[in-house]
Every structure is written in structure tokens, then in C-alpha cells.
Amino acid sequence: MSQDFVTLVSKDDKEYEISRSAAMISPTLKAMIEGPFRESKGRIELKQFDSHILEKAVEYLNYNLKYSGVSEDDDEIPEFEIPTEMSLELLLAADYLSI
């Protein structure tokens, strides 16, 4: 795998490839990638999250990367949709990932 990407693995063993730049938005993932951990090899197992939660977290990291330099007043930024039924689990994931 290219060093430009990181693979995140969910509790149910689904894999999500994410750009290293997007992953580095999360201080937690950044520490894993840059540290002496086996995760620094480009594969990070996040076994505390089901795939639908990890997928939404990856979506958010990509969204954040894409719109990070855009003014909040810009009408071009779409709202990031969070389904109500996922709110609590996403809050826990966001807390863990510090995003």
C-alpha cells in the first residue's frame, strides 16, 4: 500500500482506505501513524467501532479535509448530514478520534 493512504479496519473487519492527509486531521490517528506502533505501517484496527460508524467517521474526515480552507460564510459548503439514529455512536467515535 502506498504511504499516501491508511487503512482503517472496523469491528466487523470492513476496511476503509483514507488519505493520510485526511487521517492526520484526527490527533488520535496522527499519533498512531507517527508513533512507534504497528499502526504506523498504514493499517489501523479500530475494533471498537462498527463499520457504519467508521464509514461515517471516514466521510467526515474527508469532508473536513475538502472544506478546511473554505470560509464558513461560503454558500458552497454543504451541510454534513448525521442521521439521528447514529448520533450517540458517532459522538463516541468523534470523542475517541478527537474530531
Swiss-Prot record:
Record-listed N-acetylserine modification sites: S2
GO cellular component: Cul3-RING ubiquitin ligase complex; cytoplasm; elongin complex; nucleotide-excision repair factor 4 complex
GO molecular function list: protein-macromolecule adaptor activity
Keyword flag Ubl conjugation: no
Compartments in which it is found: Cytoplasm; Nucleus
Segments forming a coiled coil: none
SUPFAM superfamilies, sorted: POZ domain
Description of what induces expression: During sporulation.
Keywords of this entry: Acetylation, Cytoplasm, Nucleus, Phosphoprotein
Other remarks on this protein: In contrast to other members of the family it does not integrate a functional E3 ubiquitin complex.
Role of this protein: As part of the CRL3 E3 ubiquitin ligase complex; polyubiquitylates monoubiquitylated RNA polymerase II subunit RPO21 to trigger its proteolysis; plays a role in global genomic repair. Prevents degradation of interacting proteins like PCL6 by the proteasome.
Identification of the protein by name: Elongin-C
Originating species: Saccharomyces cerevisiae (strain ATCC 204508 / S288c) (Baker's yeast)
Gene name, Swiss-Prot/TrEMBL: ELC1
